[in-house]
Amino acid sequence: MGCVQSTGVDDEAKARNDEIENQLKRDRVMAKNEIKMLLLGAGESGKSTVLKQMKLIHHGGYSDQEKDSYKEIIFSNTVQSMRAILDALPALDLALQPANDARRATILAVPGQIEAEVLPRDIADAIRQLWADPGLKEAVRRSREFQLNDSAVYYFNSIDRMSAPGYLPTDQDILRSRVKTTGITETTFKVGELTYKLFDVGGQRSERKKWIHCFENVTALVFLVSLSEYDQMLYEDESVNRMQEALTLFDSICNSRWFVKTSIILFLNKIDLFAEKLPARRSTYFPDFTGGDNYDAACDYLLHRFVSLNQSAATKQIYAHYTCATDTQQIKFVLSAIQDILLQLHLRECGLL
């Protein structure tokens, strides 16, 4: 009896052991088909926009129900941007035309978050008329002197469409919407047999301590820089230049002991807004830049500033791309280009190269 009982226990233990071994084998196979990337960059560099592009490119885009859910975000972004400009006027020594005083009061009386299926007519009319005011347009031209969302002008120019009956946000409306990222989000998509996992972390300073949870076993880092913010200050600390902050962050990530051999895909983002700022003097913010208003020279200069920070050039490669994260076709092209790079890195990581 004792021997039979013992054999039964042994059989159960062996079955459990075999099950664990089989699961470990399955996990190893899955790991070989999985590419993990960590998405990094300072606040408002375009990380969340890239993730939205992933959904458009690899997940079939947004359903009408999902698009409808973005209305409140888009309406709120639009009103918040107008309020930011109105609040900045006194410091800029600018004023509205007297006829717009009542419209100013209308916008300032609106709550920060708009919870409505349709943009109220009085708010839409106020935004439309204020956007035609010369003083307000001059404030937008000087937006580097205060905090203003990149999407402000786009939404102001779209106010007729956004306030029309039956409005449903377009892909471009959604791409330009802004919600501060907090915590860690994971985006997964498949290309062929490979599964890509992209981890996004909050870009603001207060969120960076959370990045450590994503550090292990990533195939590559995707680091975003907003080129257009070379003349702007941080949201959290208006004494710190945003480009200098991005350089400091890139330095700390690139040369971290966690990433000695981890390659970096560098997105030099917002090239469209960067080009619009060409008349602005870069030498004010980077005295060693001597390229004047030349776009290519400015791009090359900033690329060199980042790449030159790499202290492990022998073991770490930096792959740079100039991007406009709101341009789906361009991002699709860039993603296709880096998939080959990621595959090579992954095969090397798995010991298959």
UniProtKB/Swiss-Prot annotation:
- Would you name any one GO CC term? heterotrimeric G-protein complex
State the residue spans of region: G2 motif: 173-181
Which residue(s) hold a covalent lipid per the annotation (S-palmitoyl cysteine)? C3
Q: Identify the stretch(es) annotated as G4 motif.
A: 265-272
Where does the record place the region G1 motif?
A: 36-49
Residues noted as binding GTP in the record, renumbered to the chain: E44, S45, G46, K47, S48, T49, D150, L175, T181, G203, N269, K270, D272, A325
Relate the assembly described in the record. G proteins are composed of 3 units; alpha, beta and gamma. The alpha chain contains the guanine nucleotide binding site.
Its job: Guanine nucleotide-binding proteins (G proteins) are involved as modulators or transducers in various transmembrane signaling systems.
Which PANTHER family does the entry link to?
GTP-BINDING PROTEIN ALPHA SUBUNIT, GUANINE NUCLEOTIDE-BINDING PROTEIN ALPHA-5 SUBUNIT
Instruction: Tell me what this protein is called.
Output: Guanine nucleotide-binding protein subunit alpha
What organism is listed for this UniProt entry? Coprinellus congregatus (Inky cap fungus)
